[in-house]
């Protein structure tokens, strides 16, 4: 080994290998001779190994057994401390038997015997066993003297056997060969190995040295010899991927690995090569009167980590293994604190500060999907999911999960084994720097620039830049983190990484899709009062939005003053700054105001972005955050066509590329209503704009939107505008043929997406008689059954919800038909009859019951917690029929050729027209079932799972307040952004 310890340690290291295996020679002439021998051996190369068949393995076992019997001599008095050869050799024997049992038949055994690594390993094991036997023969009585050179050589062989056991277990975990899949801890070191050696498990030292020299120059043959003795832990003239991983972890970082090795192993007097725990203690005993004396060695029980032994102020000798930091940093910190002052008792303590040059941290950028996902859960990607207080600043290697340093330290100090998330062995850590999500980086924002029909795929973020950056600056204070494969996917993801996977459905994410975190009972106690955390079910905290939602009851619905909308053939001009819902009954649209104030209250914990649920909706789409008055926000999204459509388009692409993409692809919002935020109040803006939802891909029934616009007395016909983002004929008479790809809407009566809540509700309010019918005259949006109620639509009580032409006079086709496949009628149909949900939605008496309609999201209710159910993501017509019961959680690819529908229009105000009253009476028989559905939808909108809501309502006998209390007591709602001010 390349040791700078005293010459005694240098001579000690030469006995086992016959040359200088670890120490430098004080004699330059001898060093040159040894270097010449090494060069000759490199030129010749190691001999080829014979096949390691069963006979060879059994012969090796006999040699190992003989070594064990020799070491069991009572006169030897071996100490039962690592490395204990009487444990190591039997363990090696057992693991070899396990390997042979996995390759029992002849074909597999032949494959094993020809395995390059296994042949080299068995040959080396046989040679080391013979060498140990020779020690006893040559040493004779000196073997029983604890301080003799022969005894020291036996101890060194014990260390080598220990390294070999660790290596065979790493390459053959559970007896199966995994050398080609071995994961090197440091990413840059792994890249080096893959580049030069591919999937090889072991390479000759000569080849390894040449390849390493191309990246890190090796100055001389003597340095190469010393380097080999450091890396070649098993002393077999080969470098395995396992040994390379250990070396890179010990002398990290990779960019300066040889420089670090020279400072720490070659020139540092405190480095001890191949020393054991007992030997370190014995060596420091002579410095017991000199506190601060220290030496360090490779840990034999935790390969890849350092063990530092030092003398305390009271003369005791302690040994410690530093965690989560390079050795030079641990030595610098210990020197500053007065623990590591005199290496090997010497007065000169090398200055290692030069090794502390700032190394570039692993910058992790938050993807749009991660950003939206964590916003929907009321958290931020960079927030540590264990404590929910600090930012993630460290990455665990090799699994890639992310967390804050304080949590990792606490976990390790409490004897936590492995990664807190996946329990994978922690082989190292890397500091990370979180970069905030910036939509400009990937053209995620778009602006319509007053164009009437800007194609949905054109990305132009100029208009949104300023607003998006507001959120991004806030988020940057908390430093958002990318995937570690980035991820990071926190981890996911976490991390990580890291290996980003398609984000799961937001409808399920809060409960299922994030890695579990270590339980934090203390945090669970104060979960509701603490900042939000994006961890999954195991998360110690629940989102404060769930607490504060209950504080702001929504006002009763405004009086029904709505008029029938004009014909749907309206032109679609839409000013970019128009607001759809901003000026709809400003005085009555209290939910908007509540939304704004609630955002402020909800995010009071930290504007730095640790928990930005308020901005989580907005930041993504660029709407103002945290009390900043939103000029126009639909469901917490900026209603500017530029902002919302920009993200819609991006999500549109995402849905096309990955069918399982989450529903939150709507302007960065989850398709489920529980994550949508009702529009905020803001000064009356220009005429309203209608954003098109990518998942809907249809020009949303503009007359429905105009219907809402008509809701305001001061609005004129100019407010009937088709979304400027319409990629298809914006002047079409708002036919539902564009909705033909929404069988979910038709088949389940569900809201297509959060972006279409209003429009869909409008669609629903217009009884859809036939596929593709135009919603022309319906003025009162009849709520569509929520995503959660879709599963119940097949139930008997939902007969009114059965998708029949009679039930959906205007829009919904018969279940047997392809939804909206028929060509749209050229003329607007008569006012549609109210759907089953109408009694709750339109009748003032039912205002307390939240209808299943998604449009109800925008309806102010007297009930303090009207939350709409989670709308499912859109799916293809064929899929919708086959998966009706599971649609609420499905994330489905958008139809690329389908026109895009606007995002949520403003809240429709129920009107009491004769047709509605008539239909209300007609479906009054089912109002009870719909009331139950509305209650389920309301509680689901607060973030509780469907099954728990259903069970709680059964226990509470359909009493919403009692059910809510039960859910809060026994089911932690996932942290979500407040959408309705519940």
From Swiss-Prot:
Pfam families: Cbl_N, Cbl_N2, Cbl_N3, zf-C3HC4. SMART domains: RING (SM00184), UBA (SM00165). It is found in: Cytoplasm. Residues 483-497 have a biased composition (Polar residues). Residues 179-251 are annotated as: EF-hand-like. Residues 355-383 are annotated as: Linker. E3 ubiquitin-protein ligase which accepts ubiquitin from specific E2 ubiquitin-conjugating enzymes, and transfers it to substrates, generally promoting their degradation by the proteasome. This protein has one functional calcium-binding site. This is E3 ubiquitin-protein ligase CBL-B. It comes from Xenopus tropicalis. The gene is cblb.
